[in-house]
């Protein structure tokens, strides 16, 4: 992925970024005293709403989703490598597979939960779940869906569908990261999986769950194995864990989180914030 290949795309991104809500605009929105003033602040952005729509959560969600769909559609259209965009949309693909699997298991109408973002259409994903056929997607996707469905048949527990697709997502994410063969993208995949594992272990420890519970939820696709993550975090070695998974050089913004790790006071929500911070800094 050379700079020359993406130079035109980067220009297009710069133009589109100019229409986004800026940090200062966002702060103004938070401090805005009325729907009318928020309407004015949103004019000229992809999220323009009138004062009545702003009060309607359904209308607000629909507008945000429309804007999100438009951005990803544009990204797929202009990117010289669609897999690069897929790296960021894959979470929607596996969310949709969960929805279709749950529909298959319960026969409940869940279509309102589908998010039509990603390289595979909803029709392709629905067909995949119905037939376990790999006609329009990689064979390993069909294998993971079929294996997850078989496990559900054995245990009759909907949580199996959630866990199976989460772990399949991380395997697919690792595959994409390796195939794109760019150090920053490989680090991004590591960070995504490493933080998922850590957040999962943190919640499990807070709830005093056993090792067996943790192991069934964790992925071995990160930079540390599930066993290593459990051993480190169960013994309170949060800082050791972070030093091993953090791809960034020294950053003053991380000090607060590191101190809380050192004193054992880091909360789950702070760990989630830290993941976002590391990813943002990595891609900046």
Where are these regions (language model features)?
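Extended alpha-helical surfaces
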Residues: 1-284
């Amino acid at each position: 992925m050379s700079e020359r290949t993406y130079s035109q795309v980067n220009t297009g991104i710069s133009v589109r970024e100019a229409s986004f809500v800026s940090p200062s605009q966002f702060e103004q929105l938070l401090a805005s005293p009325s729907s009318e003033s928020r309407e004015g602040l949103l004019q000229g952005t992809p999220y323009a709403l009138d004062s009545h729509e702003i009060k309607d959560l359904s209308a607000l969600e629909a507008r945000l989703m429309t804007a999100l769909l438009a951005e990803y559609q544009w990204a797929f259209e202009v990117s010289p490598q669609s897999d690069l965009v897929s790296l960021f949309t894959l979470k929607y693909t596996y969310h949709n597979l969960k929805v279709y699997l749950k529909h298959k298991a319960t026969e409940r109408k869940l279509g309102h939960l589908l998010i039509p973002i990603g390289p595979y259409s909803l029709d392709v994903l629905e067909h995949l779940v119905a037939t376990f056929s790999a006609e329009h997607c990689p064979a390993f996707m069909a294998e993971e869906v079929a294996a997850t469905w078989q496990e559900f048949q054995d245990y009759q527990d909907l949580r199996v569908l959630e866990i199976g697709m989460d772990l399949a997502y991380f395997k697919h994410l690792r595959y994409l990261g390796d195939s794109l063969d760019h150090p920053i993208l490989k680090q991004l995949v590591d960070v995504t999986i490493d933080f998922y594992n850590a957040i999962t272990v943190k919640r499990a420890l807070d709830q005093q769950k056993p090792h067996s519970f943790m192991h069934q939820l964790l992925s071995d696709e990160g930079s540390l194995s599930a066993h290593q993550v459990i051993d480190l975090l169960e013994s309170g070695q949060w800082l050791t864990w972070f030093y091993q998974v953090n791809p960034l050089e020294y950053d003053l913004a991380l000090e607060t989180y590191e101190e809380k790790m050192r004193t054992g006071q880091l909360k789950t929500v702070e760990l989630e914030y830290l993941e976002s911070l590391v990813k943002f800094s990595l891609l900046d």
